[in-house]
Amino acid sequence: MKRIAIQGLTGSFHDIAAHLYFEGEQIQLICCSTFEQVFQNIKQDPTAIGMLAIENTIAGSLLHNYELLRDSGTTIVGEHKLHITHSICCLPEDDWDTITEVHSHPVALMQCRQFLAQHPTLKNVEAEDTAGSAKMIAEGQKKGWAAICHAEAARLYGLKVLEDHIEDNKHNFTRFLVVSNPNKADMLRPLTETNKSSIVFSLPHEEGSLSHVLAILSFYKINLTKIQSLPIIGHEWEYLFYVDVMYDDLTRYRQSIDAIIPLTKDLKILGEYKDGRQTN
């Protein structure tokens, strides 16, 4: 049985993404309160696998997770793109005329602003976790309280769903990365089946340095799908570039990496994996 470390509780979006990615397999969740703890679990147990959100189509990139990933010594072995939907739920005996406040993670509250604006009497209360809000209401029997979470979390904790799909944007997706100890990578994904890679590097503070790297990737027909820059602490106006690329020829991709190494500083391959499927 695979042991999967996630940030959040049972019923969280990380939980749902993990079960969809490992669909058909038995998994055991290691629920962590922080992303740092996710990586710590992998460090302590080389057989553990981690799953962490890295970007959202509305909220953008989770910048801190890029730093954790680079420093962790783990490697990316997969990804999953999850359609994010929100429901409002409460205790079975409550209803619209009895709830007075709604609890959820601040990002979830933000993603349901239009819906909440239609219910101006509801007090919005920020919490650490969407599923955690549902669990708190269920276990504490908090009458008059509602939670915004995934419908699966409501079912799991025995709450009643007042309304489904209350998110403002119906095309909201979060991309999750699957990470592991590098020694376990080949068991989790055959290298010959990969078509995507994540790399990080810095560049000399010279004119055109980034464009030269991108030109070489283009020459080798490597498709750039994402680039994210983060400042290097203590080095003014110097940046780390986190780049995702896709390829259909592993040998040509490896040649492109060899070609850009002399133009970059501290290039590191964060993982080679298969482009993840998108689930609704």
Give the residues covered by each predicted segment.
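Domain-level signature for soluble enzymes in the chorismate/prephenate branch of the shikimate pathway
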Residues: 1-280
